[in-house]
Amino acid sequence: MKCLMKILGFMLLATISSFTPAHHSHGNYEMTEYVHLEGIVRQLHMVNPHAWIYLEVMQDSGDEEMWALEAGSVRALTRNGINEDTISVGETVSVRCHQLRDGARGCLLGFLTGTDGVERLWD
C-alpha cells in the first residue's frame, strides 16, 4: 500500500508540474550593457509569448539595417500601460536594448521612447 501511495503521489506531482509555466532565460543577450538605437518601426507584433518590433536603423554609412527587438509578454506590457496604440508602424523611436551575444541584429528590448517623448519599459 505504501508503494502504491508513493507511485500515485509521484504521478500527481508529475502531472501538476507539467502545467507549471516555464520560461527561457535571457542568457543569449548581453545583459550587462545597453545598445542605443534609433529607427523607424517597420513591424509591430503584439503576440504571446513575446511582442516583437522590427526596427529599421540607418547606419552612419547610409545603409539600412533591420533589427528584431524582443519585448515582454502582451500581459506584462499591458500592466505597464503599453498596447497596440502606444506606437505605430512608420513611427521613429529610440530604444535601449540588450543585444544578442553573438553580435547579430537582435535585442531584448528594455526601454522605448516614441514621438510623444515618453520612455516606457517594454520588458
Which functions belong to the PLM regions below?
Residues T20-V35:
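Short boundary/loop segments of OB/S1/cold-shock single-stranded nucleic-acid-binding domains
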Residues L100-D123:
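OB-fold/S1-family single-stranded nucleic acid-binding modules
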